[in-house]
């Protein structure tokens, strides 16, 4: 399971002209799932992301987590995170999980975040989406449950 994590002051996702999810300060997470991922991968990254100290304390030092700040998460499924570009000019997405497998794990991931007390907004799985965000910092991290 792979994430692109961005600290944001605000973020939203729109599908067919309608806002599907919107957050204030928190984390925008693009979520990629491969065919080898399990609920253990989702649990590991859910725990990691809510406790990741990427928010500033009163001294301006990144010392606070999402749980510490009461921030929100905008979670957007993103199979293209598993795109392979070594050969040719068109990405190969064979490493991405099939949609029927990925949607279950994506929903589990969001459920695990909510169980930790975090407000989670989402896009619509499998839809074409427009994502807008204001990256704070900028702080952008790539997280992988296998690395």
Curated annotation (Swiss-Prot):
It comes from Bacillus velezensis (strain DSM 23117 / BGSC 10A6 / LMG 26770 / FZB42). This is D-aminoacyl-tRNA deacylase. Belongs to the DTD family. Its EC number is 3.1.1.96. Pfam families: Tyr_Deacylase (PF02580). The gene is dtd. It comes from the Bacteria. The keyword Endoplasmic reticulum does not apply. A Gly-cisPro motif from one monomer fits into the active site of the other monomer to allow specific chiral rejection of L-amino acids. GO terms for molecular function: D-tyrosyl-tRNA(Tyr) deacylase activity; Gly-tRNA(Ala) deacylase activity; Ser(Gly)-tRNA(Ala) hydrolase activity; tRNA binding.
């Amino acid at each position: 399971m792979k994430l692109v994590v961005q600290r944001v002051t605000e973020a939203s996702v729109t599908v067919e002209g309608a806002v599907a999810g919107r957050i204030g300060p928190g984390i925008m997470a693009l979520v990629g799932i491969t065919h080898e991922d399990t609920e253990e991968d989702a649990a590991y990254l859910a725990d990691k992301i809510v406790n990741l100290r990427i928010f500033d304390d009163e001294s301006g030092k990144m010392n606070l987590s999402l749980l510490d700040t009461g921030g929100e998460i905008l979670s957007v499924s993103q199979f293209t995170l598993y795109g392979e570009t070594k050969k040719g000019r068109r990405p190969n997405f064979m490493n991405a999980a099939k949609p029927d497998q990925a949607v279950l794990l994506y929903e589990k991931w969001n459920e695990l975040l909510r169980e930790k007390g975090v407000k989670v907004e989402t896009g619509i799985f499998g839809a074409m989406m427009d994502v807008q965000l204001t990256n704070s910092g900028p702080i952008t991290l790539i997280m992988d449950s296998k690395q």
